[in-house]
């Protein structure tokens, strides 16, 4: 398993962070908090229902910064952004909680989820079952598993932990080898294809198109990164890809929800507002 240098650095710090979190709050307490959290909102179902109707199933991201681009949004109020996305037609939210590299916070996820009715994925680098239980404790409805950061045994363990606490799983791949591992190891219906090359950081929508034939029809493909204009959306929809994870394009807009509506709905002749019921 070849892990890109930037990702290695993030994962090394993440291992330290998890140890620090465990020292502050033990697993038994996190499990107690997870049991008392609001019921999951059905992240996978929200996407699957939209895709079934051939409507855009948009996971709208709340992200303050990134390692490569720095701060993306100075005026950063997660609750405000969440409400804007919900009004703009998002199916789900993605909230960055990584502190050191993305200037995220658990509090951002809590604030965003409390401000709307949308299901939320905790976007972070998951390497320990503790983080999965913690995700449920802070209110997440889904977690992300990045294949390039995990071996198959750990990936399966994390997915099993997610299932045990009622969380959906979005598995993220970057190439055919990772896709093969993901399909062999996990039964989650959500397969995210990141169009960004982790080694070169170049973005190409061809990554999604190239991998599509290898993905069983009972899995929902979520294309991630590189959706910047209406032509990009239509390219995916022609190939029957209806689920999208978009962050940077929205974060740089004055009104993120309005930008979402413009990109995915305005030129379709109809605007879908709000979240689908679970």
From Swiss-Prot:
Enzyme class: lyase
One GO MF term attached to the UniProt entry: indole-3-glycerol-phosphate synthase activity
Biological or metabolic pathway of the protein: Amino-acid biosynthesis; L-tryptophan biosynthesis; L-tryptophan from chorismate: step 4/5
GO biological process: L-tryptophan biosynthetic process
Keyword Hydrolase: no
InterPro entries, A to Z: Aldolase_TIM, Indole-3-glycerol_P_synth, Indole-3-glycerol_P_synth_dom, Indole-3-GlycerolPSynthase_CS, RibuloseP-bd_barrel
Membrane-crossing segments per the record: none
Keywords of this entry: Amino-acid biosynthesis, Aromatic amino acid biosynthesis, Decarboxylase, Lyase, Tryptophan biosynthesis
Pfam family, one: IGPS
PROSITE patterns: IGPS (PS00614)
EC number: 4.1.1.48
Reactions this protein catalyses: 1-(2-carboxyphenylamino)-1-deoxy-D-ribulose 5-phosphate + H(+) = (1S,2R)-1-C-(indol-3-yl)glycerol 3-phosphate + CO2 + H2O
Family: Belongs to the TrpC family.
Protein name: Indole-3-glycerol phosphate synthase
Species the sequence originates in: Pseudomonas aeruginosa (strain ATCC 15692 / DSM 22644 / CIP 104116 / JCM 14847 / LMG 12228 / 1C / PRS 101 / PAO1)
